[in-house]
Swiss-Prot record:
<feature type="binding site" description="axial binding residue">
    <location>
        <position position="52"/>
    </location>
    <ligand>
        <name>heme b</name>
    </ligand>
</feature>
<keyword id="KW-0813">Transport</keyword>
<feature type="domain" description="Ferritin-like diiron">
    <location>
        <begin position="1"/>
        <end position="145"/>
    </location>
</feature>
<keyword id="KW-0408">Iron</keyword>
<dbReference type="InterPro" id="IPR009078">
    <property type="entry name" value="Ferritin-like_SF"/>
</dbReference>
<keyword id="KW-0409">Iron storage</keyword>
<keyword id="KW-0560">Oxidoreductase</keyword>
<dbReference type="InterPro" id="IPR012347">
    <property type="entry name" value="Ferritin-like"/>
</dbReference>
<feature type="binding site">
    <location>
        <position position="94"/>
    </location>
    <ligand>
        <name>Fe cation 2</name>
    </ligand>
</feature>
<feature type="binding site">
    <location>
        <position position="54"/>
    </location>
    <ligand>
        <name>Fe cation 1</name>
    </ligand>
</feature>
<protein>
    <recommendedName>
        <fullName>Bacterioferritin</fullName>
        <ecNumber>1.16.3.1</ecNumber>
    </recommendedName>
</protein>
<comment type="similarity">
    <text>Belongs to the bacterioferritin family.</text>
</comment>
<dbReference type="InterPro" id="IPR009040">
    <property type="entry name" value="Ferritin-like_diiron"/>
</dbReference>
<comment type="subunit">
    <text>Homooligomer of 24 subunits, arranged as 12 dimers, that are packed together to form an approximately spherical molecule with a central cavity, in which large amounts of iron can be deposited.</text>
</comment>
<feature type="binding site">
    <location>
        <position position="127"/>
    </location>
    <ligand>
        <name>Fe cation 1</name>
    </ligand>
</feature>
<feature type="binding site">
    <location>
        <position position="127"/>
    </location>
    <ligand>
        <name>Fe cation 2</name>
    </ligand>
</feature>
<feature type="binding site">
    <location>
        <position position="130"/>
    </location>
    <ligand>
        <name>Fe cation 2</name>
    </ligand>
</feature>
Length: 161
């Protein structure tokens, strides 16, 4: 089915963000795991995989519209050098995605593409869940300090990889 070019463009814009998020969350997973934040690392891994599923849905929709998914470029990664920076970097990415998806859903609505609008609504709901988690973690980190936060997010030595 031939798709509306503006919708295909917005789907590719979202793919750009999701592919960057896959890589950023995966690298943060590996860094956090290495730093001993194994529980938070596990969450970052789960987020990376979820973002990969988002990318797959976008690719599928672009192909359905006889468009070409652009996997050549990804959004720039924001990589934290400590646990606080990791959380802040991820939060910035989620804020960017939320703003983009809000705009995209409106464009799809105006063009009468309710299925793509629904996809953006689904992505938006997931990103808002990520935002809530990250904001909560940053608030917790500020309240209890990095040392205690680290204790909460480290697995016992016999559970580490």
């Amino acid at each position: 089915m031939k798709g509306e070019p503006k919708v295909i463009e917005r789907l590719n814009d979202a793919l750009f963000l999701e592919l960057g998020a896959v890589n950023q969350y995966w690298l943060h997973y590996r860094l956090l795991n290495d730093w001993g934040y194994t529980r938070l690392a596990k969450k970052e891994r789960e987020e990376s995989i979820e973002e990969m599923h988002h990318a797959d849905k976008l690719i599928n929709r672009i192909i359905f519209f006889e468009g070409f998914p652009n996997l050549q470029t990804v959004s720039p990664l924001r990589i934290g050098q400590n646990v606080k920076e990791v959380l802040e970097a991820d939060l910035k990415g989620e804020y960017d995605a939320r703003a983009s998806y809000k705009e995209s859903r409106e464009i799809c609505d105006k063009l009468g593409d309710y299925v793509s609008k629904q996809l953006f609504d689904e992505l938006l709901a997931d990103e808002e869940g990520h935002i809530d988690f990250l904001e909560t973690q940053l608030d917790l980190l500020a309240k209890i300090g990095e040392e205690r936060y680290g204790q909460l997010n480290a697995a016992p030595a016999d559970e580490a990889e």
